[in-house]
Amino acid sequence: MKQLAHLSLLVFITIGLFITCKSTKIGKTNGQEYRASIDDSTLYAVGAPYIMPYNRVLDPAGVSVKFGDETYENHSLDAVKLPDNKTLLVEDRYGIAFFDLNTRQLIDRWVYNSDPKFRGAMSTFSGISAIIHHDSTFIFWGAGGKDIVLEGGQNTKANSYVMQAYWDGKKGRLVRAFPFQAEAPATIALPNQVLAKQENGELYFYAVLNGNNKIVKVRVSDQKKIYEMPTGVAPYGIEIIGERAYITNWAGPVPDSTNGMETAGIPWGKAYVDPKTGAMSQGSVSIINKNTGISQKEIRVGLHPNAIISSFDKKFIYVANGNSDYISVIEASTETVIDSIFVGLFNTRKKFVGSTPNGLAINEEGSLLFVANGLDNAICVVDLKKKADGKNYTIKGFIPTEAYPSSIVLNRNELIVCNLEATGARAINLTDFDEIGSVPKRKVRAFNSHKQQASISFIPMPNEADLTAYTEKVKKLNQEFRLALTERLPRPNIAPKPVPERIGEPSVFKHVLYIIKENRTYDQVFGDMPQGRGMKSLCIFGDSVTPNQHQLAKDYLLMDNYHASGKASAEGHHWASAAMVTDYTEKSVRAWFRSYPHVLYDAMVYNKNGLIWNNALDHGKTVRIYGEACDFHYDESKYDWKTLFQMREKGTLGEFKYHSTTTISRIRPFLSQTFPGGSDENISDQMRADDFIRELKELEAKPDGELANLMVMALPNDHTAGTNPKYPTPRAMVADNDLAVGRIVEAVSKSRFAHNTVIFITEDDSQAGWDHISSYRTTGLIISPYSRLQKTVTTNYNQTSLVRTMEQILGLPPMNIIDATALPMFDCFTDQPDFAFQYKPIANKIPLNEMNPERKNLQGAALKYHDQSIKYGFHEIDKGNDDILNRILWFSAMGNKKYPAKLAGPADMDD
């Protein structure tokens, strides 16, 4: 555990230029007045301020305490003060942790892996409870993810449970687990918030079952289930006042098939959705009789209601609506919503969605409400006024935290905050590498996106002056000054530019092709390029495997300070397409109990404004989607990788029948049904390139043929399938992907659309490898006649910068608070185009059908990794243990060369 004392407000003043604009002088070109000093920095940092890969800087108030095994990706979820008022209990993804409130020291930790019955289990989303019963302190919380065997050896066939632990003042120990079975079609019951209550001398707990859409009441002494009754869709939080229990439902009421409103798929059912975006359109609070479980009423609130608390006098209930950026105020006596408190950081200026309130606390006087705004990285302080009528309030200010505050505990005169994302994935691995060209060996650092500690912050309650200063600090840390770029009106008679300075001014481009690939870090691919800041010893897919991407970086530009904003594909595709993630995604990180939505098939994942194609359609632009945001269907028993590859060589692919589906009704007309999927590795990326090039040529041949204004393409095979013998070797699959990129670029550069088309290429995330500067650093390419810079661009960009640039080109406003504060990629373009240059792809140096060897020919590590490739199903995007896949890729490319294992954990973790 480390204690990091962060810079004070006075010190912060001295570094103000670090996070503010370099100049406010009007009249500069290419957006120079909107640049900040962070734009020249990398993400590497050993202390605050920390630059995050989504236009935010962390410089939190108070003292932050880190904990957790650095070989994992740790997240603190929720916290509660124990009844002794001396101990803080934190629920984290891998167990529970006890802290001394006076010393702030970790005094005990219980983890699931310490008990063989629970090895591999994880805590659910939030909601831990502590209570004294018969002079003993008991703790209850929800967990899931593994079938458990209880006393007597009976397999419960339940992969969800409410955990009960005991605290003796020094150590915590597990008492028992209460199992809950999934109810079809759900695959996991998912107990989330648990409330322990004493009633008539007996100890009970109430728990919402997020997967089963139920609430359950259990008597602890004999484990008897008093009732299990229905709620709305995906219940999350619970509060009890008198005889009523109030339950927040992430996805609102259970749909009624007779009302004609649009619904779409979520895990294990349907939810009401907005037909324009595919996102959830309702959230609700169920009210039940706490003694019988019988439903009394269901109240409409905002979108994605999560945290729920009551005032100390029990007159009012406050509900945080994560996707609406406001708090619903419910009057308990009338059971109606009487007000909404808008808590977004930028709400008073312009209602950009994205602040994401998801945690609540209220002081004993009932005068102050504290709201954890996840994507603001701040606590919003609301003055409820002494009148306390639920209608009079003011926003007093904001307090800076670490990334994604998720829970708040009040302890005397301080706030204790769980920071779900801490400072990001910054755990440093120092290990020995043979750095090419260096003698002797030296220790170097390496980062991976799934290595980070959990964090909690202890923040003294600010006075008025401190809160005013904190508020200004939060605005600076969140790049508020860049909102000016979104608010300036377009000027008349402005000549077209590659990236217009103002939204609505003309661009030289009419068409944007956006290609999303899978999971590589910068050093993995470009680490061998002397033009950038690379590390050759981490480069496993260098020039011999990816000659086209290397050549494109030389012919156009190399970005060596470009970052993925997320850490896995389930996050990455949302960052790449929506420029933000929702609370549903953040609360699911690493556990993914309900879904792993990298192909965007879960309506609960989307924010209310949707994704970039919604933005384009809303503003009259044409859209075409190739393999993104869809599921791909065909007869998998008949077609495998080798069969389809051979059919392509023989010219018989016409026999291959398939189709794509999406939960988003609005984009169905624009989803290509000839493009062969975007998440299935049985499909060679050459087949995908073939289809796009065919369609391009058909459009080119028509006098009125036009490309869509926005084209979004999934090109996934650089993900690889490990060393599964049914698939090519990792280097062959990456080479397949590389050749497809080269062929697509060639086709566009030689077409009649070349002069007004720009191609953006990004990885969805950077999880499957190592980088020596940042775990988020990845490969990105920009290709157009106006991008023939033939130089290295070192500006700090990320996926939200890329999305903002596409919006700026197409004349689209930002979708949310993240892309609204992103820096467009002005540095990647010139006003002097090169229309003569046409790209010629470089033939693959690795045979695309170089198959992984069969098991009978293997031994040692090769045999081990063969078996794990099959066991964990790496042929499906991001299925299985990411660290094991990283080891497999390293071994496949580097043989017995030392793996950066210190922070990856011991090799026996693979087993």
PLM-predicted stretches and their roles:
Residues L4-S8, I13-T14, N55, I287, ...:
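Disordered, low-complexity tails and leader-like regions
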Residues M1-K28:
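Bacterial Sec-dependent N-terminal signal peptides
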Residues S23-P496:
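Predominantly soluble domains enriched in secretory-pathway, periplasmic, or organellar proteins
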Residues T468-D911:
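N-terminal pro-sequences and low-complexity stem/linker regions of secreted or lumenal proteins
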